[in-house]
Amino acid sequence: MTEKEQDLILTHLTLVESLINQVGYQKGVVGMEFEDLYQIGCIALCKAAAHYRPDRGATFKTYACRVIRNMLQDHREHAS
């Protein structure tokens, strides 16, 4: 992981908890604890940092939110 990717992750780490709360994940709702969802969100944030392309026009925050939300939704669907 590059230093730039690490900076993006550390700067935007609060997005993970925010998105978990926004999408309405509550303890036990999808059979996963908050800590599990947080871990999935952090993995998604790392993935977003690794694949982010600023030349595509989106801010990192916008891109990361999409990647995190999609990964959380995928896990919710597979847990159902």
Spans of model-derived segments:
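Alpha-helical promoter-recognition and RNA polymerase-docking modules of transcription initiation factors
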Residues: M1-S80
